[in-house]
Amino acid sequence: WEYERIPGFGKIELNDIVVFNYPSGDTCLTAPQYQAADFYGMVYQIGSELCNPVNLDSMSFAEQQRVYDFYYKVGRKYINDHPEQFGKVISHPVDRRENYVKRCVGLPGQTLEIKDGIVYLDGKANKQPDNVQTNYVVELLQPISAELRKEIRLSQEDLPEQMNRPGTHIFPLTPMAAELLASNKAVAQSVEKYDYPYYEWLYPMNLHTGWTVDNYGPIWIPAKGETVQLTLETLPFYERLIKVYENNDLRVKNGAIYINGEKAESYTFKMDYYWMMGDNRQNSADSRFWGPVPEDHIVGRPVFIWLSLDKDKNFGQFGKIRWDRMFRSVKNYN
């Protein structure tokens, strides 16, 4: 039967930490090594790797669409033809998708843009969370001690043994941690912000924008009852929302857009949408990769931390349970 959700009692506010169903998790692969992968990103990437390289910068929007459609068909066929590598392609209803926890950095009706890692809403900079992390290029002179690693909150996952050696490395750090590490001249010769390179498969995946995770947009976040003008240039930003989340039959024929069989030059949204991003800004799978989150994917707000484990320690080892974080309000991490 059709999926429905009982209306909630709360309202998502800007900078709230939110639990929601993974939007891109409607389709996934059964092979264990690919179960957590973004299916659509894989399809486009595989398709592009199997095709001859093309210069998208010199193409019109319509020409780009034909290229990306071809990438998708080639990538999807390759995955379907190699079940021994990828497993089966399966579908998940909304309530069976993985729960994600991210911060809401954009509300319905706002225009979002990211400049040098800072989120701007309607032209004004949004407040950065106190513990936001970005990647830094660190020139180590000697290994970071366990005490210093704990102080700057670097786990063994962030700092594996092969990286904790003299040389140049990339670490996720808060501004305070970066300042602390930079002040320790015996350990680090330099600590500089990492300039994240261009990555092709950001949202929307079927448009060559030239955006990066640190310089992204502008993009308008749809609001219920608001109308957007549809052209071949704007369609990639809202195509998935109209087709998948709002259950419409959308097609492009001879350069014209049709919704449910009728020629369409505009569309009025049925739901509110939210822009979610992780506080580990350059290492987060979030709306920059799969777009706005529809209201019917929202589960709620986390209230408190009931269990916190140190992933660098084994069970039975002193300090495995981080008692200082237990039962703390999630709001303490704003």
Question: What is each PLM-predicted segment?
Answer:
Residues 1-334:
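Extended hydrophobic leader/signal-anchor segments used for secretion and membrane insertion
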